[in-house]
Amino acid sequence: MEKRVFLIVLDSFGIGAEPDAAAFGDEGTNTLGAIANHPNFNCPNLKKLGLFNIDGVTVGEKDAAPIGSFARLQEQSMGKDTTIGHWEIAGVVSPKPLPTFPDGFPDSLIHEFEEKTGHKVLCNKPYSGTQVLKDYGEQAMKEDALIVYPSADSVFQVAANEELVPVHELYRYCEIAREMLKGEYGVGRVIARPFLGHTADTFYRTTNRHDLSLKPPRKTMLDLLKDAGKDVIAVGKIFDIFDGEGVTEKIKTTGNTNGIAFTKALQTRDFEGLAFVNLVDFDMLYGHRRDVAGYAAAATEFDKFVADFIPGMREGDILMVTADHGCDPSYTKTTDHTREYVPYLICGKGVKPGVDLGTRLCFGTIAQTICDYLGVDASTLDGQSVLSDILK
C-alpha cells in the first residue's frame, strides 16, 4: 500500500495562549477565538475533524462524533516565528531564540550592505510591512534606495519597487545579506519584499516574495525521509524555510487559493512520502494586518477544501492539519506573531475517529508520527509519536 501524508500548515492558526505567553507579551491571545464568532467563519468540516473538541478550545460547538483524531500541541522552542515553528514541526527544537533587532541593525552592518549593493538603505527599524511602504516608498524611489527593516521576528527584510529594482536583482541583494548575516547576526530569514505602485496610497506588495533561511542546525524530518528514499514535496514557502534541505520537489505558490489547488492536484499523483504544505495568507495577509474578517474568510475557504479533499483520500493517505504559531488578528498591542498552542488534526481511512490525544508537549509530535507511519527511524528527532494511539 502506497503511504502518503499530506501535512498542511495553516500559517499562524493558533488556538490559545501558551502558559509562557506573558513572557512574549502575548497573554490572553487566541487566534481561533478571534475569528470563530465572525460571520465570515463557517467551518463545519474542521468541526468534524475535531477542531472544537481540542483541549482548551472554548469557542465553537464540539462535534459529537469527530471523524479524526486531534490534539493540542505546545511549542518547546524559545520563539514564536515561522522558522523555529516549522523546524520544531520537523522534529528540531530550538532552545535559544534566533536574534532579533528591536532597535534596528548595527550601523556597521548597514554600511557594509550599502557598499555591497550600491544602494542607500532607508528605515532600519521595526515596521509593519504595509506601513513601511507608505512612509518610505516614495523616498526609496526618488533616491534609488532599499528599504531595510526588522520585525519582532528574526528577519532582515528588504523592500524595493520592481520597476526600479528588478526582482532577480533584489534576490541577489538578499543573497548578499544572507551571506553577511551569520553568528550573532544570524537571523532566521532574509526576506525579499518587492512592491509596485507609484505613490504612498497605491503601493502594494507583489507575490514575488522570497525567503532565504538559515539552514536547520541538524537533520530534520525532511532529511530523514529523503535519505530513506521517500518523496518530500514542498508546497509554498516550505522549501525556503528549510533552505531546500531534505526536499525532493518544490512547488511555488502565490497564496492560499493557489496552494490549495496544488495540494488538490497532488492528491491525484502517485508518490510515497510527504506533501508538506504552507498556506501563508492566514499570517501574511490577515494575521499581521489584524484583519479578523479576512482571516475568518480564509478559514472558511480552507474548510471547503477539506470537504473536497477527504472523499478523494486513498487507503494509505493521512491528512494532518496544524500551525506554526499564532497571529491573533484581534490583538492590538502589536502586529506581531503570538505565542499560542496549535491544533493537530489527523484523519484518514486508517485513522481512528474521535481519539482525543490531549495536550502534547512538542510540535515534534508531528515529525515523529509521520516518520513512524512511513517506517523511517526518527530517534534523532525531538517529540514522541502518537501513531499507536491513532491507527485502526
PLM regions with names:
Residues 1-392:
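Feature captures the catalytic ectodomains and active-site-proximal regions of enzymes
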